[in-house]
């Protein structure tokens, strides 16, 4: 796992984790463990380290971490704090130190004080047999702060109702993560 700012990466997943034993443990779905000479941690919004298994922002540091963004001191100060590169990625670390990427922090929806990661909701919606594509966003909600709203594109010759999509999601994920509303559209903007 890495990004340009972590050039080239801070975690690695060995080929042995793709074999049967690693698959049984689910480690083939991870982004690996910290590489030699690198450190990775997961923190909350106040940069406090989270317990293993809790989702937060993934931070990395090591010899390849950037020195800064060219002529962008404010962006550099926001990204590099306390010697750690704040990736903007949300994920968790398991008890063995394997990192599991979940989403982008900025895509997180906060509904009723609960963190909802868009990718988890989108995966649930996408598993509905009538759905070709989908996207979810947080929309303002008077009571909850934000509510999950879904945009769905149906497969040619298929149809679904908002109620069907919501009921399908309730079978896949926790109720507070399910969309409260669904808009059906012809296509998602792609760029």
Kindly label every feature range from the protein language model:
Residues 5-6, 188-191:
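A short acidic, often aromatic-flanked loop/helix-cap motif at beta-alpha or helix-coil junctions
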Residues 4-99, 105-108, 121-122, 131:
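Conserved AMP-binding/adenylate-forming
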Residues 10, 180-181:
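Extracytoplasmic/periplasmic beta-strand context in beta-sandwich domains
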Residues 40, 134-136, 182:
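Generic structural signal for residues in well-ordered beta-strands
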Residues 62, 67-68, 78, 90-177, ...:
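AMP-binding/adenylate-forming catalytic core of the ANL superfamily
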Residues 55, 147, 181:
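Conserved catalytic motifs of the protein kinase core domain
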């Amino acid at each position: 796992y890495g990004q340009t700012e972590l050039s080239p990466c801070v975690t690695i997943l060995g080929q042995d984790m793709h074999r049967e034993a690693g698959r049984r443990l689910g480690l083939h779905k991870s982004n690996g463990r910290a590489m030699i000479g690198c450190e990775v941690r997961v923190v909350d919004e106040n940069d406090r380290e989270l317990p293993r298994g809790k989702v937060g922002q993934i931070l990395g540091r090591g010899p390849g971490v950037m020195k800064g963004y060219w002529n962008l001191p404010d962006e550099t100060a926001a990204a590099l704090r306390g010697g750690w590169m704040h990736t903007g990625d949300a994920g968790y670390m398991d008890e063995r130190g394997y990192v599991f990427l979940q989403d982008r922090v900025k895509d997180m929806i906060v509904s009723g004080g609960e963190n909802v990661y868009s990718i988890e909701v989108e995966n649930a919606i996408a598993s509905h047999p009538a759905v070709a594509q989908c996207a979810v966003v947080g929309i303002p909600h008077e009571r909850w702060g934000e509510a999950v709203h879904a945009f769905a594109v149906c497969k040619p010759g298929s149809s679904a109702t908002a109620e069907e999509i919501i009921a399908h999601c309730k079978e896949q994920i926790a109720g507070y993560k399910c969309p409260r509303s669904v808009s059906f559209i012809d296509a998602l903007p792609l760029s």
